[in-house]
Amino acid sequence: MSPIPKELPAPPAHAPAYWAEACKHLVKKDRVMRRLIPQYSAEALQTRGDPFITLARSIVGQQVSVKSASATWKRFSALLTDLTPANVLLLKVDDMRGAGLSARKVDYLVDLALHFTEDRLHVQDWERMDDEAIIAELTAIRGI
């Protein structure tokens, strides 16, 4: 097993605020990450957009190949010029099904959109919330 490094390189400028602490924790707790984090220290997660789109993409991509998820996402997102929770709620189920979404995934996307439009998620507070509170909010959404 590789030894725990005494100090990790500084995170890249584009890294989220929590990145250095998360890397430090993972290096201590996971033997694979202990080797990978120093090796890829110039890398960091970056946001791919707003939380609604990120979660919607996650739902679309569940239990399918990356290629299939990408094709389905492309067809689904083409249904709208502006992919927002409110606009998703305006879509017809048949149109979403025609984009390649299963009935269950349509239900999940509608529930996700409802959580956003009804302000049941406190996205703006997530950075200050503890993990358990965020998990509770997210797992209240069907399909998450």
Model features per residue range: what roles?
Residues M1-P51:
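Intrinsically disordered, low-complexity, charged terminal extensions of DNA damage-control enzymes
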Residues A20-E21, D50-T54, L90-L91, E132-I135:
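Alpha-helical scaffolds flanking conserved acidic
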Residues K28-R31, T47-P51, L55, K67-A71, ...:
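Generic alpha-helix structural propensity
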Residues L55-R57, M96:
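Amphipathic alpha-helical segments that form the core helices of the histone-fold
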Residues V64-S65, A69-R142:
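Alpha-helical ds-nucleic-acid-binding substructure associated with the helix-hairpin-helix region
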